[in-house]
Design a protein with these regions (language model features):
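A short, flexible loop at the N-terminus of ABC-type nucleotide-binding domains that lies
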Residues: 3-6, 12-25
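Helix-to-loop junction immediately C-terminal to a conserved catalytic motif
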Residues: 54
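Conserved ABC transporter NBD signature motif
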Residues: 62-70
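Short coil-to-helix segment of the ABC ATPase nucleotide-binding domain corresponding to the Q-loop/switch region
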Residues: 100-108
Length: 137
C-alpha cells in the first residue's frame, strides 16, 4: 500500500531570467514498510524534496500525497493540523523552546493540538530516548 507519493513535483525559485528549478517533475512512490534514502550532491534538491514531503513548502506544480491525502492542496491551517498530527520532521538544526524543560517541549505539540496528554505515552517516549536524567520540573 502506498503511503507517500509525488506526481510530477516541480519547485522553482526566483523570477525570469534567474529562475532556479530545484525539482523537475519528480515522481516517487513509497509503500508501507519500505525504507528509502534520498541521496545526492549539494544543491541537487534533497532538502527541497523533503520540505515538500513534510508539508513545509508547496510545490510550484505537481502533487504530494500522504496516506491518500493530497497535502499539496491543503490551505495553511489544514496543513498545520495535518503536519502536527501525521508527520514527524527532524531538522538538521533543530530548535527546542529554550524556556521550556524537556517534558514541556515533548508535550507542546499535543497541547497545541488541544489533545489530552497521555502520560504513559509521554513516559515511554522519555524512556525510549533515554531522557529520564534530563527531566527538571
Amino acid at each position: 500500500m502506498s503511503i507517500l507519493k509525488t506526481i510530477n513535483l516541480v519547485k522553482m525559485y526566483g523570477q525570469e531570467p534567474n529562475i532556479v528549478k530545484a525539482l523537475d517533475n519528480v515522481s516517487i512512490e513509497i509503500n508501507e514498510g519500505e525504507f528509502v534514502a534520498i541521496i545526492g550532491t549539494s544543491g541537487s534538491g534533497k532538502s527541497t524534496l523533503l520540505n515538500m514531503l513534510g508539508g513545509l513548502d508547496k510545490p510550484t506544480s505537481g502533487e504530494t500525497i500522504i496516506c491518500n491525502k493530497t497535502i499539496s492542496r491543503l490551505n495553511d491551517e489544514e496543513m498545520t493540523i495535518f503536519r502536527r498530527r501525521n508527520i514527524g520532521f527532524v531538522f538538521q538544526n533543530y530548535n527546542l523552546v529554550p524556556v521550556l524543560n524537556v517534558y514541556e517541549n515533548i508535550v507542546l505539540p499535543i497541547e497545541l493540538d488541544g489533545s489530552k496528554i497521555d502520560t504513559n505515552y509521554v513516559d515511554s517516549i522519555i524512556n525510549t530516548l533515554g531522557l529520564n536524567d534530563k527531566l527538571i520540573f
